[in-house]
UniProtKB/Swiss-Prot annotation:
Catalyzes the methylthiolation of an aspartic acid residue of ribosomal protein uS12. Its cofactor is [4Fe-4S] cluster. Its EC number is 2.8.4.4. Pfam families: Radical_SAM, TRAM_2, UPF0004. Binds 2 [4Fe-4S] clusters. One cluster is coordinated with 3 cysteines and an exchangeable S-adenosyl-L-methionine. This is Ribosomal protein uS12 methylthiotransferase RimO. HAMAP family: MTTase_RimO. It comes from Trichlorobacter lovleyi (strain ATCC BAA-1151 / DSM 17278 / SZ) (Geobacter lovleyi).
Amino acid sequence: MSNLAKQKVSMVSLGCPKNLVDAEVMLGVLAQQGYEITMDEKEADVIIVNTCSFIKEAREESVDAILDLADRKSDGNCKTLVVAGCLPQRYQEELAKELPEVDILIGTGDYPRVAEILAEHHAGDAQIKYVGDPNYIYDEDLPRLNSSPGWYAYLKIGEGCSNCCTYCVIPSLRGPYRSRPVEALVAEAERLVKGGVRELILVSQDITRYGSDMDDTSSLAGLIRRLAAIEDLKWIRLLYAYPDGISDELIELFKTEPKLCNYLDIPIQHISDNVLQRMKRRSSEEQIRTLIARLRNEIPGITLRTSLIVGFPGETVDDFLNLTQFVEKAQFDRLGVFCYSREEGTPAAEMPDQVSERVKRERHRKLMKTQARVSFRRNRAMVGQTEQVIVEGYSEETELLLKGRTSRQAPDIDGQVYITSGHAEIGDIVACKITDSSDYDLVAEMIEE
């Protein structure tokens, strides 16, 4: 083994779970080549920052992380700073010029070559850039080092996006939508489950588009059936399901497949037709309202999550009032709100009637306040119910309390359950009775068998 391969590597992954999978692939490739992976950035010879560039706040977070870690080159062990992902894919020349502390820039199409690129850099001293066409798609033969807790993992079922939302830069950063083959996904899922994973969370830019670019009859529902046949897999969770792609077949599967969590993340972005049309979304207000009502009616107890954008160009006072009233009526269990970010190169950036930052922030505050009331009522209604909870560790406040998630809660983005009684191993799925609630979290007692 070369001295290069004995170096320690640390990874900082920013942004969404899809980014996290890319980071895990890079770590897997490096570990396979003999690099030692460390969680301690102070020990690392090589630090990789896997960046997000979706909106302004994500870019700022990425740049702040890069600048912070650049200091490690002067006061720590770090000799090589790598910036990967969406930020260099979008701003390679600017980063190379403004951040000379960065040694390597890797775009979204070159993750599997990370070890090769490091070797090339160490053979010379110059800053190097690998930012080509974003045509990479994860292959199951690539090693992947799961950085999530061992009982759950994200399964990236496709790459890129073929939607044409006027506010979004993702298609230019990730390319058109490409589905991964069913057999490849099943093979990866089986490997993850064999390693102890009990919950698979399906992700891509638009999971309902899965199979639409393939010549066979592959579909999201068909993929779920194949995954559900894996013996020791307990939960399958769906994130990023576009409303216009939710099929009758998928709705039926929620009724019949016990491993499919009664949970659906549907990013609708807005409800007013005026805004939806300017966003170039494919669903209308009537279609969205009909879908939400149908899901509530046909799948009793389903947990619905969505994301919304406030302050989009041309959003009027009436549009925002309509959105607020819709949030009250739809009663989403979970909801995220983003202020519109004016992204260079997108059609929306050139639209008239841009909304001021002050108005955006005020609308964000009002909508989150509305949702807090909804969430409190939804959680309060769960008191007295029995739920299956996956145990994830001890509470930050005291080791006398366990914490976990019900099947109604996704990792990181939803609340937690604090378990006040009983004993279980981390990763166990146990029955708990909900005894109390807050806006976003639950309290429960374990039901002893």
